[in-house]
């Protein structure tokens, strides 16, 4: 069972790395005219960093068989999951608003109501859903 958890964690990390790269490459880290994000970089990188730390703890647990490390990794994952839920809720809310704005104005689909192109709206839906499924 521990190996299955490791495999799903690695798959989840792969989808997460893809989403992080897409978000960063589409303007998530820079604030230039016409682009932006509603996902603060500190939240994105805290989610990423804690998830990576939890994965490392889990690997160390597998090697040492320390029950304490398993519980610390679990507690870490609770925080990671909460941050992930906050971000996916914002992503979905912005996606609905962008679709409504595009339908009303004929503007770009990924823009918010003020016309700002949101970096997170360039992340396709399938990786977000699969990341969430494998995380559970």
Label each residue range with its predicted role.
Residues 1-136:
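Polytopic alpha-helical membrane-helix bundles and their juxtamembrane interface segments
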